[in-house]
Amino acid sequence: MANQEKVEAVALLKGKLEEKNNFILACYSGLTVEEITGLRAQLRKEGSEMKVLKNNLFLRALKESGAHKDKNISFGPEYQGPLAAIFAKDNLPTVAKVCKDFAKVNKNLIVRAGYMDGSVLDANGVEAIAGLPSREQLLAMIAGGINAPARTIASGINQIVASLARAIQATAEKNNA
C-alpha cells in the first residue's frame, strides 16, 4: 500500500471512529464472501457497519482520533491476523448480540475485543454486553416501571368508587324493601 493510500485509509478510519465511537474487533478468517455480506446486511439494519482492517493503520487511527487519543489501546498477540472493525454509535449491545448470534451459526467469526464508552472490552466483556437489553427495551422497561405505580393508584381509586357505588346500591335496595 502506497504512503498516500495509508494516509487516506487512516483518515477514513478516524472519521468512522469519531462518527461511531464504539466498536467490536472480530477475526473473520474462514468466512465466505456470502457470509460476510450477510453479516454486513444484518449490521446495516442496526445502523452499524463492518470494515476490514489493516491492523497497524487501525491502531494509528485509534491513537490519532479525538475520542480515543488519550486511551492506551494496543493490539496484543491475540489481535494478530485478519481483523474487521464493527462500528456502532449508541447501540453496541444490539450490535454485539448480532455478532454473537452470527458466530453461533458461523464458527469462523471470532470476537476478539471491543470498545464502549471509554472502556476497552475483552471477548468476554463483549459477550456480556450482548446479553444486555437493547436501548429500546431499556426505555420500555423504564416507562413500564414509571407507569406501574400510577396504574396501581388508578386501580385502587376505581375500587374505592366501585365499593362506594355498591354500598349506595345496597342501601337503596334495603330502603326500598
Swiss-Prot record:
Entry-linked Pfam families: Ribosomal_L10 (PF00466)
SUPFAM superfamilies xref list: Ribosomal protein L10-like (SSF160369)
Gene3D superfamilies tied to this protein: 3.30.70.1730, 6.10.250.290
GO cellular component term, pick one: ribonucleoprotein complex
The entry's keywords: Ribonucleoprotein, Ribosomal protein, RNA-binding, rRNA-binding
One BP annotation, GO: translation
GO terms of molecular function: large ribosomal subunit rRNA binding
rRNA-binding recorded as keyword: yes
Family under the similarity heading: Belongs to the universal ribosomal protein uL10 family.
Alphabetical list of NCBIfam families matching this protein: PRK00099.1-1
Subunit-level organization: Part of the ribosomal stalk of the 50S ribosomal subunit. The N-terminus interacts with L11 and the large rRNA to form the base of the stalk. The C-terminus forms an elongated spine to which L12 dimers bind in a sequential fashion forming a multimeric L10(L12)X complex.
Function description: Forms part of the ribosomal stalk, playing a central role in the interaction of the ribosome with GTP-bound translation factors.
Descriptive protein name: Large ribosomal subunit protein uL10
